Amino acid sequence: MAPDCVGPEVEALAKTLQPGEVLMLENTRFHAGEEKNDPELAKQMASLADVYVNDAFGSAHRAHASTEGIARFLPAVSGFLMEQELEYLGRAVANPEHPYIAILGGAKISDKILVVETLLAKCDKLIIGGGMANTFLAAKGLNMQDSLVEEASLETAKAIMANSGDKLVLPVDAVIADKFEAEANSQVVAVEEIPAGWRMLDVGPKTLELYKRELSGAKLIVWNGPVGVFEMPKFAEGTFALAKLLAESGATTVIGGGDSASAVKKAGVAKQMTHVSTGGGASLEFLEGKELPGVAALNDK
């Protein structure tokens, strides 16, 4: 283990390496120039090697000295994991098989407006769950009571629904709670019937039946974001049941990183998925159609 990632001592250690040996460098973010994509820092790191291999897809959306800058000074290629990420996520962006079903969850629509619009242009159905579904349901005129609703995104949600035809699939029932706590009282109600003082924390059984029907016959399923507060056992059933539906679907299944990857692992079905991405923000930006700096810098993509 080197004491730093650049400098005379690191250079000396690099020169002593024998074939088959590995020198692990210190965290590049200990240098302020890393996140600033400082060309001098990138050049110093490049001086330690003959070839740069980027296998960190999860950092590919960041233009840092160790992801984008260094590639200006060395032959730069992708590693096997990076290659796999680009292959499977690339299918969803460039040449998806149909029927193509996309699933988006998570808390906020504001974080995923661009990916919603991009997916609607390519997929056959877009299933919306999680906290972001509350905003769509509120935009339809439903009283979501104490559920998380992004008031500032209501008009955006209305516009998306107006332009989506019959592609958008929203929850029809919900597991609700009287407080946002693991031990809260809970019950299942239709999304139109949430009582005052309660909030939606998971999708209900009728919604899961709807998901099952929509996923039937799919050739490609891309999932990013849980459909409930799966960190709390009482409100994890929807997310885990959805993971199992994907595992049994027979489709090519691509799981976005972050919470979705954690969910399929906790559900015990990660090995039954075609591809579980290691990139949270990176996979989302890739699905939005953005060019990732760490990928664009490579000689082979």
Describe each PLM feature range.
Residues M1-K301:
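Active-site loop-to-helix "anion-binding N-cap" substructures in soluble metabolic enzymes
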